[in-house]
Amino acid sequence: MKKWLFTSESVTEGHPDKIADQVSDAILDAMLEQDPESRVAVETLVATGVAVVAGEVTTKAYVDIPRIVRDTILEIGYTRAKFGFDGETCAVLTSIDEQSPDIALGVNKSLEAKNDGKDKYDIIGAGDQGMMFGYATNETEEMMPLPIVLAHNLARRLATVRKERIVEGFRPDGKTQVTVLYEDGKPIGVKTIVVSTQHDPAMTQEEIEQLVKEHVIKAVVPEEMMLDGIETFVNPTGRFVKGGPAADTGLTGRKIIVDTYGGWIPHGGGAFSGKDPTKVDRSAHYMARYVAKNIVAAGLADRVTLQIAYAIGVAHPVSFMIDAHGTEKVALEKLEKVVKEVFDFRPAAIIDKLNLRRPIYKQVAAYGHFGRIDVEVPWEKLDAVDELKRAFNM
């Protein structure tokens, strides 16, 4: 029997980096709502008393960026200066240029299209080079690794008890971390839980610990999942009053492991938020998850990792890899062949298949882009299962 521990973390919507992600995606959604063809690459920085939005945009839409920034920050819960940040009074600075014409050359007309390609999906070239990964497993209902599922659920619950005033005195910033014991590739139980929550200065450490255990941890982690001798750390520094952008500068794209699989598989390095779907950093990651999830749901493997790579301005991927980690129920060579036949990984085909030119991104800018069962997103659908099964006469 092989045993090991694996740990993943999540953060609340009030974490500075997540504020930035949500602002960037709120701006993207507003532009896509008016102009689905918008080209958007928007980065956000939040710091003490200020939010800065910069990037490259080509769109027919008119968007009141400062208002979107403020509304997003207020919705998260930064509504009073004593919380360290106030969406109504913070300064908002913007610096927006149009998309580089050199990049647009390759995105507007791919290398294949320039070489007289007549296929409609050859028109759009990848918006950048890079490699993207997708993963799915049958170990949880979400088809995600258990550590990241629990970490997200704890972070989301932390926000819920604050927003619904189940607990008084919690503030928006917070982090969670979960360590799970695995045995022969299967999760056995939870070994360690870490929860840190920003709080009112009048609250005592003992009070915070009791409230977190009662209203957050018990509500998320079933008792039978907790191993004997489980360690629980609540605000282990002993104080977390100063939080949010007043304590740490937040930037778009700094929580890419939280956004994906909690470190379970490799990551190509590209962030999601603030990017329209011509950016394969976003769309190809979503497609890789969609394909992996359908493979596992079809019973072709217990868990699977995909890697796709692109060259800027070229529609077809330059490489494709599939690894079932020894859990495949069919020949791996045939599985790769079938996947390439059933799914089209060119950017225009991905955008069309998943209907990505819509304002659907802010809702996944916190608590993970994958394994979401609380919102409906196209890359989590299981509508390719039957086609995959037919290919293997199942």
Swiss-Prot record:
Region (Flexible loop): 99-109
One annotated Gene Ontology cellular component of this protein: cytoplasm
Binding site for K(+): 43
Residues annotated as signal peptide: none
Positions contributing to Mg(2+) binding: 17
Cofactor annotation comment: Binds 2 divalent ions per subunit.
Binding site for L-methionine: 56, 99, 248, 279
Residues that, per the record, bind ATP: 15, 173-175, 239-240, 248, 254-255, 271, 275
Keyword annotations of the record: ATP-binding, Cytoplasm, Magnesium, Metal-binding, Nucleotide-binding, One-carbon metabolism, Potassium, Transferase
Biological role stated in the UniProt entry: Catalyzes the formation of S-adenosylmethionine (AdoMet) from methionine and ATP. The overall synthetic reaction is composed of two sequential steps, AdoMet formation and the subsequent tripolyphosphate hydrolysis which occurs prior to release of AdoMet from the enzyme.
Annotated family: Belongs to the AdoMet synthase family.
NCBIfam families assigned: metK
Protein name: S-adenosylmethionine synthase
